[in-house]
């Protein structure tokens, strides 16, 4: 309890001990928001993708990293994304389709010139084998996110420089999320 005289005050705390309850509370608020928007049973992978997509890089190269993860949580950015120029950004949630092994989905997205693009793919993986080699990846479903620009340049998820996706890199393993952030470039 923090008191200044007889008045309550706010204390500043940091670290994972404070970040965990903040993110848990934000996840609960995001779930409530989705329910009010008509998503009757929002899954945890959808909520995780929303929170990752709205995070703000706080300056430690490069995201994600052990010091800041995906950055500072911003529920405003997550639920009401706005571009750097102040325009409302379109949001698409597709969590109704199932992907069969060895197959993929292709989406064509038109992006206005000068607008950026943030994409997060997240999923709840099946439990791994308890008899698998302890040093082996336990990921059962290994999904990859790639984005190809109109001029044929391909970007892989989770490959960043200065907070933005860059070409090159290798497929990211073993994680159950992948993220891509494009500069204000013509990507569709």
PLM regions: where:
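Single conserved hydrophobic/aromatic residue that forms the stacking wall/gate
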Residues: 1-10, 179-182, 186-188
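Short glycine/serine/threonine-biased micro-segments
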Residues: 3, 13, 67-69
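Hydrolase catalytic cores
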Residues: 6-7, 11-61
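Conserved beta-strand and immediately adjacent loop positions that scaffold enzyme active sites
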Residues: 7, 142-144
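Noncatalytic accessory or regulatory domains flanking protease catalytic cores in secreted, cell-surface
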Residues: 11-16, 64, 146-181
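Acidic glycine-/aspartate-rich tracts in secreted/extracellular proteins
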Residues: 56-59, 124-126, 152
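Secreted peptidase-domain scaffold signal
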Residues: 64-141, 149
């Amino acid at each position: 309890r923090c008191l200044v005289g007889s008045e309550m005050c706010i204390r500043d705390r940091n670290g994972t001990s404070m970040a965990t309850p903040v993110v848990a509370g934000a996840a609960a608020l995001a779930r409530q928001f989705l329910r009010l928007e008509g998503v009757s049973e929002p899954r945890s992978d959808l909520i995780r993708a929303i929170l990752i997509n709205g995070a703000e890089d706080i300056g430690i190269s490069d995201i994600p990293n052990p010091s800041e993860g995906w950055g500072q949580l911003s529920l405003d950015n997550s639920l009401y994304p706005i571009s750097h120029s102040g325009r409302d950004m379109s949001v698409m949630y597709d969590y109704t389709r199932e992907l069969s092994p060895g197959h993929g989905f292709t989406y064509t997205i038109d992006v206005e010139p000068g607008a950026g693009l943030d994409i997060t793919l997240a999923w709840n993986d099946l439990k791994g084998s308890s008899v698998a080699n302890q040093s082996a990846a336990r990921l059962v479903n290994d999904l990859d996110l790639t984005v190809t620009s109109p001029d044929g340049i391909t970007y892989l998820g989770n490959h960043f420089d200065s907070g933005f996706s860059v070409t090159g890199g290798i497929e990211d393993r073993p994680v159950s999320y992948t993220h891509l952030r494009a500069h204000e470039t013509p990507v569709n």
